[in-house]
Amino acid sequence: FFTGSITVGKIVAQQAAKHLTPVTLELGGKNPCVIDEPASIKVTAKRIVWGKFTNCGQTCIAPDFLIVNRKIKEKLIKEIINQLSLAYSNKPIESIEYGRIISEKHMNYLSSLLEDQKILYGGHFDIEKKYFEPTIIEINNFDSKLMKEEIFGPILPIVEYDNFNEVDEIIKRYTHPLAMYIFTKNIAFGKKFLESYPFGGGAINDTVVHIANDRLPFGGVGSSGMGKYHGKSTFETFSHYKPYISRPL
């Protein structure tokens, strides 16, 4: 069993294959979060902030970036900033609720993602203190390092769209994410949307909560991992079913 990066996950799988040892890999990816026209901008923003910035963005199922309907983009950004101030105050560096980055190496990686980006909010960091301010970025192209690699930190890129053909094109750039989310007041559409793409697990009108349900299996698919665990699935993952029969003589 391994939890970590795709790069190391491949190494683990290669080494396990030498011994024909089965593995469960819980990896990651760029988890998209689509914001259609939700019933409540306030609740949507609150749930995005919680899911994205918990543990300073260092969770494998955090929304990596938002794909937002142009009609509500400005309202949503304004409310996300408001919810950030409510969660971590206007000075997150002084908030006991706001975390720190795991290492100086990761700080250097995150700071490199900001190069040549349009910062809408935040962007300040202190490598020595391992502090990285909650940051919102407006995305106009997908060629940057920020939009090619998993972030795993408190940087939230926002991409706008006008129609779902654009959303489809964007999502297909990032195959097999570990998680996918959509906020919409049309639940039937939300279900149909999530059923259209391969990913590990997700939610409609929330983020990350699926990991807390011990009746749901948790795991990735393709580049985001293989195998599953949680609840009954954990016993199955760490067990070998050894069938046999007994017949009378």
Q: What label would you give each PLM region?
A:
Residues F1:
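N-terminal Rossmann-like NAD(P) cofactor-binding module of classical short-chain dehydrogenase/reductase
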Residues G4-F142, I204:
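ALDH superfamily catalytic-core signature
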Residues V34, Y131-L249:
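Conserved C-terminal structural/oligomerization subdomain of aldehyde/semialdehyde dehydrogenase
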